[in-house]
Design a protein with these regions (language model features):
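Conserved catalytic loops of nucleotide-sugar-dependent glycosyltransferases that act on lipid-linked
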Residues: 74-79, 83-86, 99, 103, ...
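Single, functionally critical "micro-switch" positions that shape active/binding sites
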Residues: 17, 51, 162, 240, ...
Length: 321
């Protein structure tokens, strides 16, 4: 369908920072793909203070909505502001660096049926620092899967679609850097919203990567742990307390047998530390449960079962998954 600035079904949010070489090609590829689909759409381009002429070129394109930053704020800030400005019920995220299959954006919208978010799971790794990046991403993804108790094929793909009404509840939690995509996945899972995945091809990006391996990997790890601590602190702290308690208890048994019932100070310190961490975990979980906001937006799976707004929930309450 055609571009609509009034009441689009789909809003496509694209962060741009110094992408002048392939900007026109990517935007036209996105427009052609969406015009061939059944969805009315708008394209929101957020220029993150480009210095290569991207801003000036974007200002000449009449069929996009342009948001231009005066200072560089990061891809997370760009996508967050673009999503807040979106008018469509569905928001698509992608890039304009030739890495994602932007001609398949309508496929994401179709796959969203029955889900709150759909992520394009990359089948190959074509990024920079490949030798170090692949094992680092594998470790972070496995950590996220363990913390969230959910299978996650691709944790930090920037090619995704989601319901805007759900995302609006959590946009304030998104960091400004690259870890915002990880946050978007984790925050949906932590709050009971469904995330689906579709396999996509991933190409070597054009131009220079803005990814900083050491700094951004550290931020990914911190953000994954922070997200789970905000909604399930017992998942993080209980194993730590258990390990310390087992170590302390083993040392206690050793002291009682080997030292004529004299318990070492270090043994008591380990056991007490385990107890303190467990108490902190319980208190943190209590705070989370008391302060957890009541969702104003029901998950897609609940709505599909006829328990959405405006429906009688009296006889259906026991059917909630």
């Amino acid at each position: 369908m055609t571009t609509s600035f009034d009441n689009p079904q789909v809003s496509i949010v694209l962060p741009v920072f110094n992408e002048i070489e392939h900007l026109d090609e990517e935007l036209e590829r996105i427009r052609d793909a969406m015009e061939a689909s059944q969805y009315s759409f708008e394209i929101i381009v957020v220029d993150d203070a480009s210095t290569d002429g991207s801003t000036e070129r974007l200002d000449e394109i009449p069929w996009i909505r342009l948001i231009a930053f005066r200072a560089n704020r990061g891809p997370g800030a760009a996508r967050k502001i673009g999503t807040e400005a979106a008018l469509g019920e569905i928001v698509l995220w992608s890039d304009v660096d030739m890495s994602y299959p932007n001609d398949q954006l309508p496929r994401l919208v179709e796959a969203l049926d029955g889900y709150d978010q759909v992520v394009g799971a990359r089948t190959s790794e074509e990024g920079t620092h490949k030798l170090a990046r692949v094992p680092a991403k594998w470790f972070i993804r496995r950590l996220a899967e363990w913390l969230s108790s959910t299978k996650i094929p691709d944790l930090n793909s920037g090619f995704r679609a989601f319901r805007k009404d759900v995302a609006d509840q959590f946009l304030h939690l998104l960091p400004n850097g690259f870890s915002h995509v990880t946050t978007m996945t984790m925050v949906f899972l932590a709050n009971g919203y469904s995330v689906g995945y579709v396999d996509i091809d991933y190409a070597q990006r054009s131009g220079n990567s803005k990814f900083r391996f050491v700094a951004d990997t550290r931020l990914y790890l911190r953000q994954v742990t922070r997200m789970v601590m905000m909604w399930n602190p017992l998942r993080v702290l209980t194993p730590l307390a258990t390990v310390l308690f087992l170590l302390g208890f083993s040392k206690l048994v050793f002291d009682l047998i080997d030292k004529d019932f004299r318990v070492g100070t270090n043994t008591l310190l380990v056991v007490l530390s385990a107890g303190m961490i467990f108490v902190v975990a319980l208190l943190a979980d209590l705070v989370v449960q008391v302060t957890r906001p009541r969702h104003s937006v029901l998950p897609a799976a609940v709505q599909e079962r006829g328990i959405g707004p405006g429906n009688d929930t009296t006889d259906s309450a026991d059917e909630l998954p």
